[in-house]
Design a protein with these regions (language model features):
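Glycine- and acidic-residue-biased ligand/ion/polar-headgroup-sensing regions
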Residues: 57-74
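Histidine-centered metal-chelating micro-motifs
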Residues: 49-51, 58, 70, 91-95, ...
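C-terminal end-helix/capping segment
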Residues: 123-144
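A short hydrophobic beta-strand segment most commonly corresponding to one strand
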Residues: 110-126
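Short acidic-glycine-tyrosine-enriched beta hairpin
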Residues: 77-99
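N-terminal leader/capping segments at the start of a protein or of a new domain
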Residues: 1-20
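A short glycine-rich, His/Asp/Glu-containing loop-to-beta-strand
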Residues: 18-52, 58
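Conserved small/polar residues in nucleotide/adenosyl-binding loops
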Residues: 149-152
Length: 152
């Protein structure tokens, strides 16, 4: 069955993200977490926090469908080594992140939605692939401080 990516779908997933305590929501196109390729919408609202992490065994691709976001790349000590503003209105649509690269993203606009592609199957990130130098998702003050620092 064909699956259409429409304004209505983006609006729906964005609404769910705004209502979520994490301020983000996925919409999966893949049939199961065991699928060999994961394709999903990821709706992100300003204030959501994705801790810096890496995928040692897979690349990850983001394409911005609506809104804009900053993508950060870090060295092993947590220093920002590159920052990319993904913004379709500026002609920068997406990024492919090599495996093993520490990265995180910050939504800059309400209603930001990305199309994300990576290899499956889904496996929770092992502790060594979640940055030890970054605040945990439960550390709201630390997460806010990281976001503030990155946006300056």
């Amino acid at each position: 069955m064909m699956k259409l990516i429409s304004e209505e779908l983006l609006d729906s997933v964005s609404h769910e993200a705004r209502e979520s305590s994490r301020l983000r929501m996925n919409y999966n196109f893949h049939e199961s977490l065991d699928s060999p390729i994961h394709r999903l919408l990821n709706a992100l609202e300003p204030g959501t926090y994705l801790p810096p992490h890496r995928h040692t065994d897979k690349e990850e691709t983001y394409v911005v469908l609506r809104g804009s976001l900053l993508t950060f790349f870090y060295d092993d000590l947590g220093n920002v080594i590159e920052k990319v503003n993904l913004n379709p209105s500026a002609g920068v649509y997406g990024v492919e992140i090599p495996s093993g690269t520490w990265h995180s993203i910050i939504a800059l606009e309400p209603g930001t939605v990305i199309f994300e592609i990576k290899s499956g199957p889904y496996k929770p990130l092992p502790p060594e692939d979640i940055a030890p130098w970054a605040p945990a998702p439960s550390d709201l003050e630390g997460a806010a401080a990281v976001s503030y620092t990155h946006l300056r």
